[in-house]
């Protein structure tokens, strides 16, 4: 019995000594990173960042371009649906003095002449709500009853392009019998319009789709 108790006490002492033994092994013989090692690690990280950053930025730019391309296609399709549903052209619904339909975002950009705050009408008033022509609820709305009527909202939210600028439509040409080109367009990454409102093809880094 006495021998068994000694054995138990011995085990307890050994269990108490284990952490100290571990600390002893980690103490004077253990080493952290030296200054040289830290400098080498930071240098490697810097090199990796320098290598990867252009690739990451390229993918980001491509993703933004893809989004803008899909946006102009979607807006064009929604405008065509609006015309088909109502039998009316947005160009005939513009408030006096307005010649462009613009989404949210910056307008009045440099380059070719497109819409400004003075002649841009909110595109959302045609696609999100049925209130074209002005900000009053009694404006020249699209028909709301009958076979040919406004069947929106065609989209719940119209945002700016990926670079913070508004999508634009030269809507004054979007009237019956007018054969002039009509664009849904973004000024692209540089925020400058290189495509004129009368051009039949895109220029520069502009992104757009012809409605007609």
Residue ranges and their predicted role:
Residues 79-154:
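Short, glycine/small-hydrophobic-rich surface segments
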Residues 1-33:
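N-terminal leader/signal peptides at the extreme start of proteins
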Residues 144-176, 181:
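Intrinsically disordered, low-complexity regions enriched in Pro/Ser/Thr/Gly and acidic residues
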Residues 29-60, 64, 75-76:
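N-terminal single-pass transmembrane signal-anchor helix
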Residues 203-212:
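Short, low-complexity, Pro/Ser/Thr/Gly-rich segments in the mature regions of secreted, periplasmic
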